[in-house]
A protein has these predicted regions:
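Extracellular carbohydrate recognition and processing domains
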Residues: 363-410, 417-425
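Extracellular carbohydrate-recognition regions
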Residues: 142, 257-303, 434-471, 483-487
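Sequence context surrounding c-type heme c attachment/ligation sites in exported
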Residues: 149, 157-251, 693, 697, ...
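Short beta-strands within extracellular/lumenal beta-sheet-rich domains
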Residues: 317-343, 354-357, 397-401, 534-537
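Post-cleavage N-terminal segment of exported redox proteins
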Residues: 1-6, 96, 107, 129-187, ...
């Protein structure tokens, strides 16, 4: 990209910024006369309501409306914009835009709609990152490789960046695939499609079966990213909530290593190891190639172990052990991926209240599919009383054998999970063609045990240091569990001929997209999965694709129409930008370090944004003033909560369970329904279940969470009017609004005062004289109807009058909810 020259325009006095000059230049270029009709400014009410919904997803308050009406200056509007950008509501509003791109949902769909573990933490991450105005390059890099970047503390976590990597795994998935390898290929294709559309604005997934027919994307480019995804595995990791935990774990491990050096035990153990064959360290470098989460396995390669009472004992070399530092710690460890070459896989393990599983082709739903993956998950239960209080190193070893006959030739890895206060130790992994492996059974376990007696006294300061670090680590707040990504290998994926996962062609080097490498100013070094290299390529300021895509998305969300009208497809089949110069002008701001909030602020303060909706009609090759826009589903629901005075503005936390009507039936239906009003939380905090989507939100075009959606449909259909007329939610919120207006101090207000407050809440303006008169007449009719209906009742007169008042205002509230002005922006 090169910086475009800011155009000189005849109507320069109309412009407030260079953005306005680019906009006006497109109009003047179409004019055959020396003048062009300049867009008129929006009135104060329309502008405030527009900016409030665009920036916060909520209507402005009556106080904000009146303050701006009294002083509609540029400075006052800029101050309102700054307050909106600084509010928590900004992240909730713009976070929902990003969740559309991420195909965010909390279940997997298919037949039983199983949960995606802790998916809500990804939503929390997005909202927090946008509120903190994390630079776009860092934000995107965290999505691709947050676990491989320098830590970024936030949300009460020592490192929030890994939470973003759940993005890779938020798509729908099959829980009982006939072909596991094909299922993995399909899941990867979905992830690649999201990478392409959300970050490049290109349909890379079209190159899965053949070279792209229209864009310069060969099939090897698709498999370059597919290789990255296949070397990336989905795990439920542990993330520290205490920034000291990692340092304390390192201190404790160093203390154990120093103790072993002081005792001179390392040579003895290495000599012992030489007599033992097919140990885990033969295949995986003493467990150092294993990936770990949490701190339970941090000291698993130490030669000494720390007992609960503070004593030190010799530990076996070459095992993976979660109890060497402290049996109270939680964590998990995963082996590198390896090909299955024989029928049986043997693991020698011991422990209690923990479990072990074997993952085939990154298929993590083994616990959901007993037919296909029966026996791939094993639990180590609590032992009998004779072992319960003893040293973990006295626990008996056991052989766990997995039958892999159906999966020979596939890739697998072993996962150890210690998350319930127990512990687990793995001594060996071995393959054989026999169900019982003689090599495993004949290991000299007794010889090992006798050789590990600790007889040399240890210096007290060394022991105290180890115990002190262990105890300090115990005192840290526990980590959270979260869905994250990690590297599982470093191999290139072959091109799948015609998209077949069983018919391979040439290898496609990971992360080296031709369109990126051609524009990049530096070479990208591949390492591990290639995710970090991919992140570096995409966020390179010299490559225009990400920056143009993001700039276009910002313009789309603020103007209802992008500079390029197809935000997810900048290719040959997409619409050309009406101003490539303006697009590059905005994209370069992001590439050179501008944050999302900074760009949004600059655009919102332009004269173009402040123009009246639909004030001119020009060809598609020029800027179009804002159209009259319908609010999206979330804003309609949130606006009703605000109007009724019941919005719970608290932020964060687990999702509110979806409300299930009697018509929402099917397999996978949750056992309990959520509240009708979603606990009065903002819509972004409502649970998104793929098989049980909220009917009200669907009526107003909330997208299906199947793939990237950069531009929602904006339909105007009878079903929407029917939803507003008949929805249980709308009736409930109208009743709450009516009750609020007919109780407490508001009951003492005049009808006109209450009518005025309703108009401000619904439409951000005072009612006109004719509207106020009609509203009074409506209330009189409703009260009369209520009086007639209760004429024979014997209720207390005061109570009955209050009920009549509440019913009348409820009916008026419902009428305002159904008004076009309530659900549309000008």
């Amino acid at each position: 990209m090169t910086q475009p020259t800011v155009p000189t325009v005849r109507g320069d006095a109309w412009c407030r910024s260079d953005i306005d000059r680019f906009v006006l230049a497109t109009q003047e270029a179409l004019s055959i006369t020396s003048t062009v009709a300049l867009p008129i400014d929006a009135d104060a009410t329309s502008l405030m309501r527009r900016a409030s919904f665009d920036l916060r997803g909520l209507p402005p308050s009556e106080a904000e409306i009146k303050a701006f009406a009294a002083d509609p200056s540029d400075a006052n509007f800029a101050a309102f914009v700054d307050r909106s950008l600084a509010s928590e509501a900004f992240g909730e509003r713009w976070g929902r835009h990003w969740l559309d791109l991420a195909r965010y949902a909390e279940t997997l769909a298919h037949e039983f709609d199983y949960d995606i573990p802790s998916a809500w933490r990804y939503r929390e991450y997005v909202i927090d990152a946008l509120n903190r105005d994390v630079p776009p390059a860092r934000f995107v890099a965290e999505h691709l490789a947050g676990d491989l970047l320098e830590p970024r503390a936030s949300m009460g976590l020592a490192n929030a960046a890994p939470l973003a990597t759940a993005w890779w795994f938020l798509g729908p998935a099959t829980h009982a695939p006939v072909d596991v390898r094909q299922d993995e290929a399909d899941r990867i294709a979905g992830a690649v499609d999201v990478v392409g559309r959300s970050l490049f604005g290109l349909s890379i997934a079209c190159a899965r079966c053949h070279d792209h027919k229209f864009d310069p994307i060969p099939a090897r480019d698709f498999y370059a990213i597919a290789g990255v995804a296949r070397n990336t595995r989905r795990v439920e990791g542990f993330i520290d909530t205490d920034a000291r935990a990692a340092t304390l774990a390192n201190d404790a491990r160093a203390a154990l290593n120093n103790a072993s050096i002081a005792l001179g035990v390392a040579p003895q153990l290495h000599a012992l190891d030489a007599s033992i064959v097919t140990r885990i360290d033969d295949a995986t470098d003493g467990g150092r190639a294993w990936s770990r989460a949490g701190h339970a396995f941090d000291a698993s390669t130490a030669l000494l172990a720390l007992n609960d009472d503070g004593s030190l004992v010799l530990a076996e070399s070459g095992t993976i052990d979660s109890a060497r530092l402290d049996a109270q710690l939680v964590g998990s460890a995963r082996s590198p991926a390896f090909p299955l070459t024989k029928r049986f896989l043997h693991l020698r393990v011991r422990g209690r209240e923990s479990w072990i599983r074997t993952i085939i082709d990154n298929y993590w739903l083994d616990d959901r599919n007993g037919l296909l993956f029966e026996g791939m998950r094993r639990e180590l239960p609590a032992p009998d009383a004779s072992y319960a209080a003893s040293d973990p190193r006295a626990y008996p070893w056991r052989i766990e054998t997995f039958d892999m006959q159906r999966f020979i030739g596939e890739r697998a890895y072993v996962e150890l999970i210690d998350d319930r206060g127990g512990w687990i130790e793995l001594d060996a992994i071995m393959e054989s063609d026999e169900s019982t492996a003689s090599a495993v059974e004949t290991w000299d376990v007794d010889g090992i045990a006798s050789a590990l007696e600790l007889t040399t006294p240890l210096s007290e300061p060394i022991r105290v240091r180890a115990v002190g670090a262990r105890d300090a680590l115990r005192a840290c707040s526990p980590p959270i569990r979260a869905l994250v990504a990690e590297d599982s290998g470093a191999f290139d994926e072959p091109v799948h001929m015609r998209g077949s996962s069983r018919n391979y062609g040439e290898l496609a080097p990971r992360a080296q997209l031709s369109i990126l490498s051609a524009a990049s100013t530096h070479a990208v070094a591949l390492d591990g999965s290639g995710r970090l290299a991919l992140a570096q390529s995409i966020t390179d300021p010299a490559t225009p694709y990400l920056w143009r895509t993001l700039a276009n998305r910002v313009w789309l969300k603020l103007f209802g129409r992008g500079i390029a009208e197809t935000p997810d497809d900048f290719g040959q089949l997409g619409a050309a930008p009406w101003s490539t110069e303006l697009l590059d002008h905005l994209a370069l701001k992001l590439a050179r370090g501008a944050t999302l909030k900074q760009l949004i602020r600059e655009v919102v303060l332009t004269r173009a944004y402040r123009s009246a909706a639909g004030s001119t009609e020009l060809p598609s090759s020029a800027w179009q003033p804002l159209p009259v826009r319908r609010l999206d589903a979330e804003s309609i629901r949130d606006a009703m909560l605000v109007a009724s005075g019941t919005l719970d503005a608290s932020t964060g936390g687990r999702s509110v369970p979806v409300h299930l009507s009697e018509h929402m039936q099917g397999r996978g239906r949750p056992g309990a329904s959520g509240p009708v009003d979603g606990a009065s939380r903002r819509s972004v905090y409502l649970e998104v279940r793929r098989n049980f989507l909220d009917p009200f939100m669907q009526a107003f075009d909330q997208p299906l969470p199947s793939t990237t959606c950069g531009r929602r449909h904006a339909s105007n259909v009878p079903a929407q009017s029917l939803a507003l007329l008949n929805s249980e939610l709308v009736h409930l919120l109208a009743a709450r609004w009516g009750e609020q207006l007919s109780s407490g101090a508001q009951r003492e207000m005049s009808d006109d005062a209450r009518i005025d407050s309703m108009w401000y809440a619904a439409f951000a303006r005072a009612p006109r004289t004719d509207e106020r008169r009609e509203a009074r007449e409506f209330l009189t009719l409703e009260r009369g109807a209520r009086t007639d209906a209760t004429a024979d009742a014997t209720a207390d007169a005061t109570t009955d009058a209050s009920a009549q008042d509440s019913a009348a205002f409820t009916a008026l509230a419902h009428a305002l909810f159904c008004a076009k002005e309530f659900v549309f922006l000008r």
